[in-house]
Amino acid sequence: MGKVLSSSKEAAKLIHDGDTLIAGGFGLCGIPEQLILSIRDQGVKDLTVVSNNCGVDDWGLGLLLANKQIKKMIASYVGENKIFERQFLSGELEVELVPQGTLAERIRAGGAGIPGFYTATGVGTSIAEGKEHKTFGGRTYVLERGITGDVAIVKAWKADTMGNLIFRKTARNFNPIAAMAGKITIAEAEEIVEAGELDPDHIHTPGIYVQHVVLGASQEKRIEKRTVQQASGKGEAK
């Protein structure tokens, strides 16, 4: 049975108040832009969002923050969003900061059905407070728990009608593990082809992890920090 939905608006209806939402992407790279816009427009609220970051003030997950749809954020980097800062300091937003490697492994573990694992990352810091500690080989480790979500949203370069996904270069980032960790996973793809057209050796995420696919072919490609080099002797950026 095909998994292609008619639009991101149809997909957004699968997300409900109070859901835990896992979002792929890294900064603004590889984020499911159209799905995020549709979630904003739908107005669902009290979300717990799990992502590497929370976008910027006017793009990405920052749009959901600005609309006050996020109750809790589980992330590893939040420094690019002034709205995030204001909501956190005013007590509107609950925040759980997780080291980036630990966050990736918590999502991967959740998707693999692993309830928890031990890591040395964060031992002796506030990150480890209140968590179980154990010693292995003379070194202290802290217990971290796997993360799963009610819905995961990811961005793919290509998808087929059965939900098999190919990501492109650095836009792969958190997307493959996010796709594994949702009870329902929705993939926004730049191109959708018929089942069997993708080379099996090129598939990054098998369709077994993906329940729905939507086409998102015309996204705005934003850059968080643009750095250019002056052309030698001309004073012009290149």
From Swiss-Prot:
Its EC number is 2.8.3.5. It holds the Pfam family CoA_trans. Keywords: Transferase. It comes from the Bacteria. Gene3D superfamilies: Glutaconate Coenzyme A-transferase. CoA binds at residues 24-30. It catalyses: a 3-oxo acid + succinyl-CoA = a 3-oxoacyl-CoA + succinate. InterPro entries: 3-oxoacid_CoA-transf_A, CoA_trans_fam_I, CoA_transf_BS, NagB/RpiA_transferase-like. GO terms for molecular function: succinyl-CoA:3-oxo-acid CoA-transferase activity. Belongs to the 3-oxoacid CoA-transferase subunit A family. Heterodimer of a subunit A and a subunit B. This is Probable succinyl-CoA:3-ketoacid coenzyme A transferase subunit A.
